[in-house]
């Protein structure tokens, strides 16, 4: 299994969530976050924003679907300008459902 953490622009988050749902990825965690990338913020007119609001989507998928999910997120979240996000992928050894105590997705 893979844990996918996608940090995207808030304006694209619902579009990404909808695209994931249409592809069968219904289970995810969504949270508002603040951060910055390599650009170290952004300057608009005379105001410098050190950190920018983003939305983080976290989901766990089977190994054989991870690449398709990553492609879907990058395609949907793309805006053509800097600061449109980052995707982090990590291995997941086990996942448990609290209610049933069962292991797996």
Curated annotation (Swiss-Prot):
Any single GO CC term annotated in Swiss-Prot or TrEMBL for this entry: cytosol
An MF annotation (GO) of this entry: ATP binding
Name of a matching Pfam family: P-II
Keywords linked to the UniProt accession: Nitrogen fixation, Transcription, Transcription regulation
Biological process per Gene Ontology, one example term: nitrogen fixation
Record-linked Gene3D superfamilies: 3.30.70.120
Family of this protein: Belongs to the P(II) protein family.
Function statement: Could be involved in the regulation of nitrogen fixation.
UniProt-recorded name of the protein: Nitrogen fixation nifHD region glnB-like protein 1
Record organism: Methanococcus maripaludis (Methanococcus deltae)
Lineage of origin: Archaea, Methanobacteriati, Methanobacteriota, Methanomada group, Methanococci
Gene: glnBI
């Amino acid at each position: 299994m893979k844990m996918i953490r996608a940090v995207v622009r808030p304006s694209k988050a619902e579009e990404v969530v909808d695209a994931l749902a249409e592809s069968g990825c219904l289970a995810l965690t969504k949270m508002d976050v603040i951060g910055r990338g390599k650009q170290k913020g952004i300057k608009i007119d005379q105001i410098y924003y050190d950190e920018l609001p983003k939305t983080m989507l976290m989901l766990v998928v089977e190994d054989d679907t991870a690449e398709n999910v990553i492609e879907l997120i990058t395609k949907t979240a793309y805006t053509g300008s800097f600061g449109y996000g980052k995707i982090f992928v990590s291995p997941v050894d086990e996942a448990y459902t609290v209610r049933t105590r069962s292991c797996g997705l």
